[in-house]
């Protein structure tokens, strides 16, 4: 069990439950635990031990420096960069008042990042996150203090959320201005670097597997297939990625990489959950290698787009607080499920994939067939051909509905215009949904 607010505000503090395989629990284990919780009617019914007794019986064990060294010993050999290149990259790091401050600086120093700077105010563990409205690397506003620390010689800002399983990145743009990278861009850069390196050394396995979620950019699958990897898609949440990776390996395949667009990444099996510490090292080395070639991450993205076409991925959230808002969100996704618009942003809706009911519908002929067979979840996918799509997913914990947009195939300016139109039309649709 890990007690954490993760990337959320302090008021959202809770805990994550992990199983023996190192990943978070999924059905039926989570349901069985809840049933046990429901049996308790009074707090006095919960058995407890004194701290001293728990220590004596071995139920309480403290993790020391040896665990840090064990982890670093596993992860450091996974580095793909050059120590000579690393020492020339200016990196600023913040753990957002969390656990990453214990390991990331050690790992980067071991890899010869001599120009590493840390945000001292955020290196101190503090569950109130006093310098941040929300310690979320998915939010560019959280990088404010790190940006204040930067000078002209700094090339990159790396951040972790407080439990250090997510990675946030800012890099210099072509005019040396700071540019925030979304989770899809970070992931595709890491994946392309890793697979390119394996290909050069002859290390690409013939049975390699990439695991992503259904809301992750289709560009990830194009990169994976270019290098000969099989793609497996899961529901959102890294617990599903871990489950799929284990199943793949049990069938004789080799799990290479897993990612979700919400800034979670994992290479191999050194852990059973997304790993922001390894990802910080990996992205820093990617940046150093590119700088040694007088390139930036944006130059590398341009090369990836030349190979696979331009891609624009975006998340759009509509919030409706309270019970009335909850009902409004329900009506909106039901309207999309039953009567989707014929077009969005000038793109014709061709197919509807209903994960909740496991039905795939051709919107031109109205013919139906079984869906992808994922666990039932209130997710709706509208496909508009050539990899363009909208995915709607109500939040399970907040009064929000999230829309994931994946557009590709045109000039970036055209894609940006389509995205703007789609967002506007969605706003109009949700107003009509009452």
Question: What are the functions of these language-model segments?
Answer:
Residues 1-41, 135-159, 164, 169, ...:
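Phosphate/diphosphate-binding loops
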Residues 24-25, 173-199:
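Cysteine protease catalytic core and zymogen-processing segment of caspase-like enzymes
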Residues 4, 393-395:
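Short beta-strand micro-motifs enriched in acidic
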Residues 75, 79, 84-108, 112-114, ...:
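Long hydrophobic segments that form regular secondary structure
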Residues 13-144, 148:
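Gly/Ser/Thr-enriched, mixed-charge loops and adjacent short helices
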Residues 11-17, 38, 45, 52, ...:
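Short acidic, glycine/serine/threonine-rich loops at helix termini
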Residues 8-9, 95-101, 164-166, 216-218, ...:
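Gly/Ser/Thr-rich loops at beta-strand to alpha-helix junctions
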Residues 154-156, 177-179, 197-393, 400-404, ...:
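Phosphate-binding and adjacent anionic-ligand microenvironments
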């Amino acid at each position: 069990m890990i007690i954490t607010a993760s990337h959320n505000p302090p008021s959202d503090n809770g805990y994550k439950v992990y199983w023996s395989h190192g990943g978070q629990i999924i059905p039926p284990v989570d349901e069985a635990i809840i049933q046990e919780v429901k049996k308790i009617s009074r707090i006095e019914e919960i058995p407890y031990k004194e701290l001293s007794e728990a220590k004596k019986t071995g139920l309480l064990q403290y993790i020391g420096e040896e665990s840090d060294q064990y982890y670093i010993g596993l992860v450091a050999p996974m580095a793909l960069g050059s120590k000579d290149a690393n020492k020339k990259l200016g990196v600023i790091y913040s753990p957002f008042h969390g656990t990453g401050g214990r390991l990331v600086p050690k790992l980067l120093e071991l890899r010869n990042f001599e120009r590493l700077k840390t945000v001292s105010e955020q290196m101190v563990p503090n569950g109130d996150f006093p310098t941040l409205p929300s310690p979320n690397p998915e939010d560019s506003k959280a990088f404010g203090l790190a940006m204040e620390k930067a000078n002209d010689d700094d090339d990159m800002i790396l951040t972790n959320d407080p439990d250090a399983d997510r990675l946030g990145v800012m890099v210099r743009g072509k005019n040396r201005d700071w540019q925030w990278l979304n989770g899809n861009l970070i992931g595709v850069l890491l994946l392309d670097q890793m697979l390119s390196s394996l290909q050069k050394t002859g290390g690409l396995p013939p049975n390699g597997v990439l695991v992503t979620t259904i809301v992750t950019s289709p560009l990830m699958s194009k990169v994976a297939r270019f290098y000969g990897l099989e793609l497996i898609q899961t529901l959102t949440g890294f617990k599903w990625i871990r489950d799929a990776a284990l199943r793949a390996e049990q069938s004789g395949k080799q799990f290479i990489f897993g990612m979700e667009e919400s800034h979670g990444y994992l290479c191999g099996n050194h852990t059973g959950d997304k790993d922001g510490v390894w990802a910080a090292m990996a992205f820093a080395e990617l940046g150093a290698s590119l700088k040694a070639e007088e390139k930036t991450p944006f130059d590398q993205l341009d090369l990836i787009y030349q190979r696979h076409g331009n891609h624009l991925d975006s998340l759009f959230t509509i919030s409706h607080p309270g019970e009335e808002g909850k009902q409004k969100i329900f009506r909106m996704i039901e309207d999309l499920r039953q009567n989707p618009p014929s077009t969005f942003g000038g793109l014709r809706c061709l197919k509807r994939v209903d994960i909740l009911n496991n039905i795939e519908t051709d919107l031109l002929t109205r013919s139906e067939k079984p869906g992808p067979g994922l666990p039932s979840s209130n997710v709706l996918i509208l496909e508009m051909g050539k990899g363009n799509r909208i995915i709607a997913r109500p939040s399970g914990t907040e009064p929000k509905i999230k829309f994931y947009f994946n557009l590709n195939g045109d000039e970036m300016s055209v894609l940006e215009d389509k995205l703007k139109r789609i967002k506007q039309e969605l706003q109009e649709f949700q107003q009509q949904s009452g």
